[in-house]
Amino acid sequence: MSATNARTTPLRRLATAAVAVLAALGMAACSGGAGSSSSSGAQVGDRSPEQIKEAGEIVIGIFSDKAPFGYIDADGKPAGYDVVYGDRIAADLGVTAKYVPVDAAARTEVLASNKVDITLANFTVTPERAEKVDFANPYFKVSLGVVSPTSAEITDVSQLAGKTLIVTKGTTAEAYFEANHPEVKLQKYDQYSDAYQALEDGRGDAFSTDNTEVIAWAIQHPGFSVGIKSLGETSYIAAAVKKGNTALLDWLNNELVELGKENFFHKDYEQTLAPVYGDAATPDDLVVEGGVDTTSTN
């Protein structure tokens, strides 16, 4: 199915803005190089909260093309649900936030190579990832969803047999379908923006990623529907730090407890996600306060 060229949506405009500033953000990400040191003498990634305070800046990895969670807004500034959280982390440390764009597949690497202190790029906790990074307690929960053209809507995984499913590299969707549905042909992209464009251009039959994302995208793209709204088990989104940085990990977990007392993530949802989802979702379905999912039956 071909995209309608004349269609311009808020997410499309944001994607255009992201392209315009991505190079500048990338330069900022690389300016220090791997293992860069702060004014405190400690390497980014290895720093404790006190060393971050001394440096006056915390470096946070985010998505630049994944609205409404992490993206570049029309003014060329980082925005979204994860960015509001990142801004609060920086404020409570008494420092400024420096945001670095990351691809989904590079979220662990930027921590291991000392490019960021924290990854806040809508990072789903998995056992495999937990071997490479240390996850804080969760602040969001998701499952997988599948979006497809309404004219050829995919409503059950069985319909994907022999068809082409678009996924983004390094995501839980890629891992899930590789492990559970080898009958589905996967077409992989590095960037979310490229994956969505491939769907619009008709290069694949459907696209799968977190249900929160495909629901938001479909709302703003007439002609596409989320026929599968929940696939696989409930997964959790959390901040991640370099493996072994227990000082920063403990600070983040304590911060989550304090933020939970004020329902911070409900407020973040109302600011960044509610305008997109409307009645399609509620904060109680998605947010996790205090680092503990009180609705879980597991």
Regions found by a protein language model. Give the residues of each.
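Extended ligand-binding regions for polar small-molecule ligands
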Residues: 31, 83-84, 88-92, 171, ...
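Ligand-binding clefts/hinges and TM-proximal coupling segments of bilobed small-molecule sensing domains
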Residues: 32-38, 175-189, 226, 256-298
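Short helix-initiation/N-cap motifs at beta->coil->alpha
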Residues: 45-46, 99-109, 152, 169-172, ...
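Periplasmic-binding protein-like
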Residues: 140-148, 215-256, 276-298
